[in-house]
Amino acid sequence: MKTHRELQQLGLDSFTMSQFTGTGAYYRISRRHLLTDGTKHLAEKGECFWMMDAIASHLSEIGTEDWFVLVRIKVTDGMAVMVYEDGNDHEHARQEIPYTNFPLDSVTLYACWDQENWIIMLPSEY
């Protein structure tokens, strides 16, 4: 994992990430999936568009009955586990990633259905 200084240089430290509140624009990654300013920043600086694609794929499988999905990503020894839940400890899906160089130990993202698109966002953008 990266040091705090390295994360600062990448713009992925907790202070920088918490500065994303709301969003000025949406960025389409598929027909029904959008990123916010914060998740686009995370995908670019963390080189993890693969993560956004994985989230979009699972959201399509989960469906829209639950309009809110909490996504927890935890990285240990170069492997990641992505857990999709409803925010009340009910797990929708789990995916193991056998190798990743994602620079953070963990990250939590939210996904909200707006009746047309899933919007993937940082918690501070909710």
What are these model-predicted stretches?
Residues 1-95:
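N-terminal "domain-start" segment
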Residues 86-126:
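Short, compact, well-ordered microdomains
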